[in-house]
Amino acid sequence: GGFEIANSCRFDNLDGGSIIDYLTRTPSGASNRKTFTISYWMKRSALQGPTNNTLQQVIGQQASGYFRLTLGSNEQGDILRFYGGDGFEFRSKLFVRDTSAWYHIVLAMDTTQGTASNRAKLYVNGVQQTEFYTENYPGQNVDQAWNIAALHKIAAGTSSGPFCGYLAQVVNIDGAALAPTSFGEFDEDSGIWKPIDVSEL
């Protein structure tokens, strides 16, 4: 019983380096660029992109500045990598290599916070990530290149960096940095992190 996500989107981007499947959104105007939350469920179907050693961009905006949520296949393996303005960069030590598993990713941004470590928080399956290869936080009150009047992409970046896999319940919260419990919960019996209804957010 309980809530279940009805459908997911499959992105099959392994055809010789070309981006085949992706979604786009271009806001009519800018909104909150300091405080927002991005949440999505992800299941990988390939550990490499169409070429070796590429970033698979899951969600991002590169038309005006850049803000990218990616998967990196590099010397550090398949890890979560995030890039933004003012030197913001996370390279998590958590490996996401299991192509049979769903991962729930939450990135909560609030650059208005006085404490640097509160300006960006990364959660995977309900657990805040605190171990990073690279851990650089943005400056206070710095606008990010997100929620701007420019092309935002889901499952695509540059021609060599599309995402290969499934995405479900992709959510962008404008103006609030939310905890993962706004999007999921631990099952009382199994202890597994699972989705909840987000239609009221």
For each predicted feature, which ranges?
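Extracellular glycan-interaction patches encoded by glycine-rich segments
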Residues: 88, 143-167
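Aromatic-rich beta-strand patches that line glycan-recognition/binding surfaces
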Residues: 38-39, 49-65, 122, 155, ...
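Beta-rich globular "head" domains
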Residues: 34-45, 169-172
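Extended recognition patches within non-cytosolic domains
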Residues: 1-7, 14-18, 114-116, 121, ...
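Short surface loop/edge beta-strand patches of beta-sandwich-type extracellular domains
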Residues: 12-36, 88-96, 157-159, 194-200
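Short, intrinsically disordered, charge-balanced linker/junction segments flanking boundaries
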Residues: 61-71, 195-201
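Short loop/turn segments at connectors of secondary-structure elements within structured domains
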Residues: 34, 48-55, 76, 114-118, ...
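Extracellular glycan-interaction surfaces
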Residues: 1-16, 39-48, 65-141
